[in-house]
């Protein structure tokens, strides 16, 4: 009997120890789980704090981006940002010394975020996407973005209709703009100095100096184009096609830089109601009475005005000095 009681007591003691071990293991697991949760929570908090410290914002205006360009980041604007101030993304003094080492970051700009003049002046390397719903690109907003030599890209959403004056103006040519298919207007110097994708046929208006020096060979202007401003585009040779929709062209609308190319000038669609061109690429009014563009042919010593031309616009006649012979009734217009 005593031996039986002894075994019962031992069994109870072993069961108690096992229960204590299980409880202890559960406590350890709970403690470990709590530590992991706290660690993750602290990490998330750190990221959140870091993100918050990337921007200086005053009354809804992003005054300064402080995240730097040493890492490739996806910059997410806080929802409270309604405007971007001048030079908000400009490089620091130290970053200007190490331009070649900076990383490309990306950022999306909402349709309701207003861009101030020079908002991206002197910025680091960026890929900027303008989100759908935006109607225009504001004046000077991306002007001189590559001031310090950083290369950037801007992707335009399909809703944009107008590139305003000097919006993408650039002296260094370190920026490329991807144009959308519904674009209608590029105003004065809107893309001057920037590289850009093919011109969409939707464009109706090209202001003076709007395209600047061609970053690649352009042989055709947009199909729906109606107006071309002065010095709209500068080419280095080759003819350019003008559609039947063009109604108004400034004298010197297209400029051909000094070139050894024998091929230059306009090729106007025969159905155009306002202009025509000849086999040399010279540009006339539809009735042939006005000469807007001409250059000295390789076979001639001077520019000879064809018979029937009554007005010659001197600013559009490319020659050396004044050595051209006007037609019998032509009048030289110095404008």
Task: Walk through the language-model features, giving the residues of each.
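Positively charged n-region of N-terminal signal peptides that target proteins for export
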Residues: 1-4
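Bacterial signal peptide processing site
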Residues: 18-20
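N-terminal, intrinsically disordered, polar/charged segments of Gram-positive cell-envelope systems
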Residues: 22-50
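Structural signature of tandem-repeat unit edges
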Residues: 50-58, 68-83, 94-114, 124-136, ...
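Periodic small-residue-enriched repeat registers in elongated scaffold domains
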Residues: 88, 119-120, 141-145, 167, ...
